[in-house]
């Protein structure tokens, strides 16, 4: 399989590699951009919290496993917003520099922005973001192409403003839901679903 071709081993430190097997080197601003874009792609169906994906967000044991499968946390909303503000301030000071990111990350970034601009409802946006996120994960599961794209800093600063407004709107919704107090976690329940089996025979 792909992971063995690239030399990945369970007991080793496995660095991110390109499709040719070379270790991919990055920098802090690129990592922060990756975090921001991925977290925005994890907004819940109401665009309030950041989805937990069955993890233990904030070390809250009550949200282990199933409760957090469709759950989200407001604490990460605040952290992502703070990161957006920080990166915006830095990029504004160094707007004459250039930033390159892996083409897979840039594709996710473009799809996130397009989804925010075109989706008419919260659920539609959630579905579009989830689809973009899963496509990105499939492409980067074991490696990336190694090709990079140069980002336009003013355009990304504009995107950060959009993300900040989206997160702020989520805080307002959460405060309304909590009668003036901001809830910490949300749990969503699937009311309609289809069971998909990988093995058609059971």
PLM region spans:
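Acidic, mature catalytic/reactive cores of soluble proteins
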Residues: 1-202
